[in-house]
């Protein structure tokens, strides 16, 4: 059935501690995606409802400066390239505080997207409400939703950020393959590996 966004969006919670350690993360596997509407580097606003007809939507909390993100960026581009024809849409969201980390400003996001030839929307979560509502803690951090907007996988892209030739388990690709084939992923959650989101 088509995705119908909830009538309310959870408001931001001040983030000074690890919310997951307190059991306060908003989204759990099986939960419905929370709606958002964010500006992209392409000059358009993007809402989750825009992609309601997709087989799967991959939301990745990302940024410009984190070395973990930079190590995985090319793989993010390749995943979108390989799965676009199968009805998959990747969305990257930058929620970092640009006042403290100017490299994550919206103009710098535009430069990075152009430099790396991003083939997916790169969105700015200036208020940090989306990251807070999703319970995101790291960059990159993956939230994979099926065509009913249920969370089916959360965690890392694969098991080796440092060397893509040494990857043994492609968690995100495996989860996508499962959803596309009509089954649930064997692995539904892994521990996110990356930089902390830079909260205001």
Locations of the language-model features?
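Chalcogenol-based redox active-site neighborhoods
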Residues: 2-189, 196-200
């Amino acid at each position: 059935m088509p995705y119908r966004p909830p009538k309310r969006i959870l408001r931001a919670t001040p983030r000074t501690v690890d919310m997951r350690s307190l059991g306060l993360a908003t989204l759990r596997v099986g939960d419905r995606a929370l709606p958002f509407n964010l500006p992209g580097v392409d000059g358009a606003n993007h809402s989750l409802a825009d992609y309601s007809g997709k087989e799967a939507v991959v939301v990745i909390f990302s940024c410009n400066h984190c070395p973990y993100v930079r190590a995985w960026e090319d793989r993010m581009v390749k995943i979108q390239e390989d799965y676009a024809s199968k009805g998959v849409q990747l969305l990257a969201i930058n929620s970092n505080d640009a006042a403290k980390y100017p490299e994550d400003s919206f103009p710098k996001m535009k430069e990075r997207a152009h430099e790396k030839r991003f083939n997916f929307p790169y969105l700015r979560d200036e208020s940090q409400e989306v990251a807070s509502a999703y319970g995101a803690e790291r960059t990159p951090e993956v939230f994979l939703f099926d065509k009913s907007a249920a969370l089916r996988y959360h965690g890392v892209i694969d098991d080796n950020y440092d060397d893509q030739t040494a990857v043994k388990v492609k968690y995100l690709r495996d989860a996508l393959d499962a959803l596309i084939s009509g089954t649930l992923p064997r692995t539904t959650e892994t521990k996110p590996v990356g930089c902390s989101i830079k909260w205001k």
